[in-house]
Amino acid sequence: MPLTSTPDEPLPVRTISRALGDWISRLGRVWVEGQVTEISRRPGMNTVFLTLRDPVADVSLRVTCPRAVCDAVGPGLVDGARVVVWGKPSFHPGRGTLALAVVEIRPLGAGALLARLERLKATLAAEGLFAASRKRRLPFLPTAVGLITGRASAAERDVIENARRRWPAVRIELREVAVQGPLAVSQILDALSDLDADRAVEVIVIARGGGSLEDLLPFSDEALLRAVVAARTPVVSAIGHEQDTPLLDFVADVRASTPTDAAKRVVPDVSEQSALVEALRSRARRVLAHRLDLERRRLADLRARPVLAAPLREIDRREQTVGALRSRSLRCLTHAVDVAERDLVHAAARMRALSPAATLERGYALIQNADGAVIRSPAEIEAGDPLTVRVAGGTFAARAE
């Protein structure tokens, strides 16, 4: 039943506290999973106080439990341990605080953790977050390298020393964070966001040395994994040793087996690059020298050819050829004219020999009647017919007798 109140008739604090206690007590006992922090075992008290923190969100809940319940868990109940508790939420009106009264605590064993990680891995894989197609290539020579690692850790030393040994001019943007425990995920997320916003940082390395499954749990946190996927800058995962495989290895753009391997993957080796440049220069020099020698030989061959060794020699030869052709054509033309002239003389002689005038010149005469017809037989004329006689010197009239 909702409470009613007015400015003139306000409710006292005890009423509100009692109502809150009644509402919260209706929830009953529930199973809750979280990470243990701030364990307080006060001497002479049978109650142990601790804080149960959500491993993903920045949310915590105060927990009270009998000392016997904590002792039953054994030495595994330490800060950072993942547990499942069974308890009932309670509200203390006198202090106005909310707490979870726990009657059973179960450590979350490695098998259960691995099963949960496998389920999360399957979910992220189904979303395509592990796909090679979405992974970005690292820059060849980054201007600045972002490094997220533990404070004064061996991983920090390995990455920085190896990176600067390989490329002394590399600039490291270091962000020191907690790499295990309840604060690790939030600090890593803040450092990742800070470095990703810096345009000068071209690659980010998240590094940590080896550890137990529980120690490496922050690097399998779903919030961190999705932040790495959404980052603009390529991310290199360098967590633990070769055998350690947190889920960060699957979503990162590059997975390095160790922090030292991450330094080798992020920046090139100056000595190797110098040797490579020198080898390429030598190769280019050899190729260019070979090409020059080839072109030099070709030029020498061209210069040795007669047409280039003595350019006028060919002209002189051509001139002699033209002169010979002219003389030959002149001789041929003269011979042809002489032959044609002789043929013309012979033809004229034959024509003259066959001409009637030539016959008349030999003393013959041509007799024609009055009609001009040539008389070939005496029978063709009669006595007294007028005739015309043609001789070589001309014609005269005659009469048949």
Swiss-Prot record:
MF terms in GO? exodeoxyribonuclease VII activity; nucleic acid binding
Annotated Gene Ontology cellular component terms: cytoplasm; exodeoxyribonuclease VII complex
Question: Which regions span the lipid bilayer?
Answer: none
According to its UniProt record, this protein's enzyme class is hydrolase
Listed GO biological process terms: DNA catabolic process
For this protein, the Enzyme Commission number is: 3.1.11.6
InterPro entries hit by this protein: Exonuc_VII_L, Exonuc_VII_lsu_C, OB-fold_nuc-bd_dom
**Mind telling me which Pfam families this protein's record contains?**
Exonuc_VII_L, tRNA_anti_2
Asked whether the keyword Nuclease is assigned, the reply is: yes
Record keywords, A-Z: Cytoplasm, Exonuclease, Hydrolase, Nuclease
Q: Where in the cell is it found?
A: Cytoplasm
Q: Which reaction does it catalyse?
A: Exonucleolytic cleavage in either 5'- to 3'- or 3'- to 5'-direction to yield nucleoside 5'-phosphates
* Protein family membership: Belongs to the XseA family.
The protein's job, in short, is: Bidirectionally degrades single-stranded DNA into large acid-insoluble oligonucleotides, which are then degraded further into small acid-soluble oligonucleotides.
Under the subunit heading, UniProt states: Heterooligomer composed of large and small subunits.
**Name of the protein:** Exodeoxyribonuclease 7 large subunit
